[in-house]
Regions:
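RecA-like P-loop NTPase motor core of helicase/translocase proteins
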Residues: 1-201
Length: 201
């Protein structure tokens, strides 16, 4: 709940101060595996989608199986609350549909959509991106594409393994080395120590 409130507050503040479309408009949540990250992300997506001025919430996963798994989990929490897609064509229709408020998709489909649609109305909409497991796979090309194309966005990442400067490594072609450089400041933390203390793992 604290993580959800932190994200919603960040959306409110950065929207009021016109900081959407910048690193200051987002942030990341460090949640250990088994701490109810999917439920937290669902509640966040649901409440963010109801905020005044927010057009869509995109929940982005990095693999097709996670896409299906997340949809199943979301349906368990609230049937029909989110929209998943089997292809980029379906994703495009959902992005154009004002009633599709929460969309679950993969990085790959989002990348293809951006490649195929150089100009699109959705790029000017107020979009909240929530990346699940926001580590290396989201860095680089996809991140660059989003910040180039979308104008009024908030980027949030959930991760069990944040990358700090100490473990970022020197190699790689990407400018983004740490979770903070990609998503903004840490908004909430729930580590393995907290999970053990609470009896969740």
């Amino acid at each position: 709940i604290a993580a959800t409130e932190s994200i919603l507050q960040q959306i409110r503040i950065s929207t009021n101060s016109k900081k959407y479309g910048t690193i200051e408009g987002g942030g990341y949540v460090w949640h250990t595996t088994g701490s109810g990250k999917t439920l937290t992300s669902f509640k966040t997506a649901r409440l963010a989608s109801r905020m005044e001025g927010v057009d869509k919430v995109l929940f982005v996963v990095d693999r097709k199986d996670l896409d299906y798994q997340t949809m199943k989990e979301y349906d368990r929490f609230e049937k029909g609350a989110a929209n998943s897609n089997t292809s980029t064509a379906v994703l495009k229709r959902q992005l154009e549909d004002p009633h599709a408020r929460i969309i679950i998709t993969t990085i790959q489909k989002l990348s293809v959509f951006i490649d195929k649609n150089r100009a699109h109305d959705v790029y000017g909409k107020h979009i909240v991106f929530i990346f699940d497991e926001c580590h290396r796979s989201q860095f680089g090309d996809m991140h660059t594409a989003i910040i180039k194309k979308f104008k009024r966005y908030h980027l949030f990442g959930f991760t069990g393994t944040p990358i700090f400067s100490a473990n970022a490594g020197a190699g790689g072609k990407y400018d983004l080395k740490t979770t903070e450089q990609a998503f903004g400041r840490q908004l909430h933390i729930y580590t393995i120590v907290d999970a053990i203390a609470d009896g969740n793992v």
